[in-house]
Swiss-Prot record:
One GO location term (cellular component): plasma membrane
Organism per entry: Brucella anthropi (strain ATCC 49188 / DSM 6882 / CCUG 24695 / JCM 21032 / LMG 3331 / NBRC 15819 / NCTC 12168 / Alc 37)
Function statement: Cell wall formation. Catalyzes the transfer of a GlcNAc subunit on undecaprenyl-pyrophosphoryl-MurNAc-pentapeptide (lipid intermediate I) to form undecaprenyl-pyrophosphoryl-MurNAc-(pentapeptide)GlcNAc (lipid intermediate II).
Protein name in UniProt: UDP-N-acetylglucosamine--N-acetylmuramyl-(pentapeptide) pyrophosphoryl-undecaprenol N-acetylglucosamine transferase
Sequence similarity: Belongs to the glycosyltransferase 28 family. MurG subfamily.
EC number: 2.4.1.227
Keywords: Cell cycle, Cell division, Cell inner membrane, Cell membrane, Cell shape, Cell wall biogenesis/degradation, Glycosyltransferase, Membrane, Peptidoglycan synthesis, Transferase
One Pfam family cited in the UniProt record for this chain: Glyco_transf_28
Major localization listed first in the record, in broad terms: membrane
UniProt xrefs under Gene3D superfamilies: Glycogen Phosphorylase B (3.40.50.2000)
Length: 375
């Protein structure tokens, strides 16, 4: 028997849609009929939803100060509000949950005005602009890294963590293996489509500065943009360092589980996967990230001793070589960082998020949820 309808609203990018998809799987398993409200960009990411359960809502991004452009934007948002009201009158959802991005504004505003229970999920350690605009209206805020104490909305915040993919959960079963001074040292380097270019030049240059003894121990897996792939591979070949270089790895969680040390950007999904699997990391926040969310995510991991944060502007090849050499010769420190990272991982984030969603759909407050039996 179907418990009722829940609508998930998300911007049309993978970062917003993947956690929504993870929650959808969990809610469907519990007997809910789950629909997705999004924008036209979402078609390539919305495979987890049946075609008749994906609803394109008119929306627009608020950017710039041009009066005509702003007028068009607010007109699109108003039309999206009307779209959402029409949809909700038909579906009669028990809950509308937002996952960030401007396309969530019309559905969440419409739902709150129609007295439908609402909540948002924020992946990052600082709220994005859309979620920040909704925070005062919704019944609950689920956070990937947001704390439950301090801050304006702490009383309705629950730190659920960010849902991760099944391969990440499988990789988390592999314990961290510190290596001895004469053993191979597996280094994993990745940075996403925007961030990998810096690593493509900086890491090979740093490896070239390592003492021969340390360089001979390295086994590198590195993500590189397609236009950088050949140059990165050739650089390691000249140095005599075995390296697997590619624009994308389907088995990235397994490669992370095999690594002794990770160098990466600090997007919410990346940091969540590092903590669930439990690996020591040097995080280099993307310097142009909106709202400085990557810096905040990295700081959250560093605060518990799960790794270190270094600004890109501070990473000369010489500094990188120092960090690499220290990591390769301090296995006990890396093992402690791995344990610290794993201690804050949330492998059950999808379940926790679904528990909160069901509580809000049932009319409970966040305080009642916190005082009840928490998983």
């Amino acid at each position: 028997m179907v418990k009722g309808v829940i609508v998930l609203a998300a911007g049309g990018t993978g970062g917003h849609l993947f956690p929504a998809e993870a929650l959808a799987h969990e809610l469907k398993a519990r007997g809910w009929d789950v629909h997705l409200a999004t924008d036209a960009r979402a078609q390539r990411f919305a495979g987890a939803f049946a075609e008749d359960h994906v609803h394109v809502i008119r929306s627009a991004t608020i950017a710039g100060r041009n009066p005509i452009a702003l007028l068009k934007t607010f007109w699109s948002l108003w039309q999206g509000n009307l779209d959402s009201r029409k949809l909700f009158r038909r579906l009669k959802p028990k809950l509308v949950a937002g996952f960030g991005g401007y396309p969530t504004l019309p559905p969440l505003y419409a739902a709150s005005n129609m007295n439908i229970p609402t909540m948002v999920h924020e992946q990052n350690a600082v709220m994005g602009r859309a979620n920040k605009g909704l925070a005062g209206r919704v019944k609950a805020i689920a956070g990937g890294f947001l704390p439950e104490t301090g801050g304006v909305y702490a009383e309705k915040t629950v730190t659920t963590g960010n849902p991760v993919r099944p391969p990440v959960l499988a990789a988390a079963e592999t314990s961290y293996k510190p290596v001895k001074a004469d053993e191979r040292f597996r280094l994993l380097v990745f940075g996403g489509s925007q961030g990998a270019q810096f690593f493509s030049t900086a890491i090979p240059a740093a490896v070239a500065l390592l003492p021969d003894r340390d360089r001979a121990r390295l086994l590198i897996t590195q993500q590189a943009r397609k236009e950088d792939e050949a140059a990165v591979r050739e650089a390691y070949k000249k140095l005599g360092v075995p390296a697997d270089v590619a624009p994308f790895f389907n088995d990235m969680p397994a490669r992370m589980a095999d690594a002794q040390f990770v160098i990466s950007r600090s997007g919410a999904s990346t940091v969540s996967e590092i903590t669930v699997i439990g690996r020591p990391a040097m995080l280099v926040p993307f310097p142009h990230a909106l709202d400085h969310d990557q810096a905040a995510n990295a700081a959250a991991l560093a605060a518990v001793g799960g790794g270190e944060v270094v600004r890109q502007s501070e990473l000369s090849p010489e500094r990188l070589a120092e960090i690499l050499q220290a990591a390769m010769n301090e296995p006990q420190r890396l093992e402690a960082q791995a344990k610290a990272a794993k201690s804050v991982g949330k492998p059950d984030a999808a379940r926790l998020l679904a528990d909160l969603a069901e509580a809000i759909a049932a009319g409970k407050s966040v305080q009642e949820f916190k005082e009840g039996t928490r998983p």
